[in-house]
Amino acid sequence: MFAVVETGGKQYKVKEQDVIRIEKLNASVGEEVTLSNVIALTDVNNNIVFTQSATVTASVLEQCRNDKIIIFKKKRRKNYRRKNGHRQYMTVLRVIKINNME
C-alpha cells in the first residue's frame, strides 16, 4: 500500500517505513507529524483511490541542510561576474503509518 503526499510544493510516493527528505517543517527531532494533503492512495487490491480524509503519520529523524547549489551570473565582455551559493533546509522523515479514514 502506498500513498502520494504533497508537501512543500512537491509530491512524494511513500510506503510505510520509507525515509523521505522534504522541505523544512517546524518540528523537532523525534516528534510525530501528520501529513494531511494525501492526493491518492492504494487499497488492498492495489487500486488507486482518491480520497480527502486520508493522512500519513511520520516521525522526524533529522533537521539538516541540502547540498550547496552554485548560482553564477555573467555578462560577456563587461567584466561582470557574480557567484552565490545556497543550501536549502530539509527535514528527514520516516513514514510510520498510512491512515485511511473511510
Swiss-Prot record:
Q: Which GO terms describe its cellular component?
A: cytoplasm; ribonucleoprotein complex; ribosome
Enumerate the UniProt keywords alphabetically: Ribonucleoprotein, Ribosomal protein, RNA-binding, rRNA-binding
Q: Determine if DNA-binding is one of this entry's keywords.
A: no
Q: One Pfam family this chain carries? A: Ribosomal_L21p
Q: Which Gene Ontology molecular function entries are recorded, alphabetically? A: rRNA binding; structural constituent of ribosome
Which GO terms are recorded in the biological process aspect for this UniProt protein? translation
Keyword check for Ribosomal protein, yes or no. yes
| Signal peptide (from-to) | none
Indicate the quaternary assembly.
Answer: Part of the 50S ribosomal subunit. Contacts protein L20.
Q: What does this protein do?
A: This protein binds to 23S rRNA in the presence of protein L20.
Q: Which family does it belong to?
A: Belongs to the bacterial ribosomal protein bL21 family.
Protein name, as recorded: Large ribosomal subunit protein bL21
Q: Which gene encodes it?
A: rplU
